[in-house]
């Protein structure tokens, strides 16, 4: 009996020792042996090394998705009179569907930036885009003013995902020397969507005073077509998620359950969400650099939407243009944007050489000379538009003014964005979120008073008021060109939030 007890004791000890040996052996391997990474900088699975054709396809598809989201932002601007005819509301209420959509976009970065970082660009953009389509269908099917307003806000909120997160795709796909040009072409999609929305909308509503739903169904069809292309043709571009998917496939094929990617260990908790994505963007607005640059970019963005939503009204006042013809000046705006984009592309080539000479380190202040040289076109164009928009002056004159506005707008807007990214490289997402929030607030509120302003002051002085404020902001890039580096080094608050 004692011998059996002794044998049992020995067996138990040996088993425990064996378990300890196995455990020690199992955990003695370094974590790097189980960590899935890219196979060097030249790994073909890395998005930066994809064929140019694949990069261009993904850039174009994300650009089209953003085009549709921006198209939706202005698609209801020509339908204000139709809403007044359909419901017992005034003009101020009828313009709210456009404003609420843009205000919804203002809050998108706070939600969808972390969502795309956890789930990847494709899911992080396409799922909210699909939900935006559903809410747009809800607007088109609404029978009450309250339902229209509510669904428009949420359509804009979810549309904030492609508007904001798609920019990160450019960073995934293109190296720094190419990224500036890629971002310019991407920005063309952003602005052209807002430009062409009213034109198409006025076409489909021209022959009916109550057909305010038709533009919404039109954009739903366009968005569904683009979403279908996205689902089948877009590839995931976010490196950490690509590696997590690769690790999952390797675990299934090798049965080695220890294989994992660094992204598998990432968990976004509530505290991190609040600190990084809610508090930091607003905290950054308290710094002089972010505040004044964001205000400059936001004001010109607000002017863009002010012009886009009131151009038909102003040309109706001065030249009695009605329907689709009253929206054609928006083509002049897009022409100006293309010209401004050409300036940006040429300057980016010089900037790339400066970065190379500086050892690859960003030079934020070198983003500003183009704004200093061309930014004056924005206020100058506003004055030309305002004072040549008269019955006795040929229409080409205000069109030239609108094109000047478009060129100046694009140079300022893109320059401000690039300056913030170069200044806060590590926390560029927060800087962009702060900029997106403020610009959407401006764009969402300017249309509320624009028509009333032109009605009370007239086209000449109403436009001049906007132009004088824009003129007062022209010194901003000059100030930061001379003092930007000094402000960054002396501002303790920047160090605190970064």
UniProtKB/Swiss-Prot annotation:
Database matches in Gene3D superfamilies: MFS general substrate transporter like domains
A Pfam family per the record: MFS_1
Gene Ontology terms: cellular component: plasma membrane
One GO process term, biological-process aspect: spermine transmembrane transport
Keywords linked to the UniProt accession: Membrane, Transmembrane, Transmembrane helix, Transport
Recorded topology in the membrane: Multi-pass membrane protein
GO MF terms, alphabetically ordered: spermidine transmembrane transporter activity; spermine transmembrane transporter activity; transmembrane transporter activity
Record's subcellular location: Membrane
Transmembrane segments: 93-113, 123-143, 153-173, 180-200, 214-234, 288-308, 327-347, 368-388, 393-413, 427-449, 461-481
Major localisation: membrane
InterPro entries (UniProt xref): MFS (IPR011701), MFS_dom (IPR020846), MFS_trans_sf (IPR036259)
Family assignment from sequence similarity: Belongs to the major facilitator superfamily.
Name listed for the protein in its UniProt record: Uncharacterized MFS-type transporter C947.06c
Organism: Schizosaccharomyces pombe (strain 972 / ATCC 24843)
Phylogenetic lineage: Eukaryota, Fungi, Dikarya, Ascomycota, Taphrinomycotina
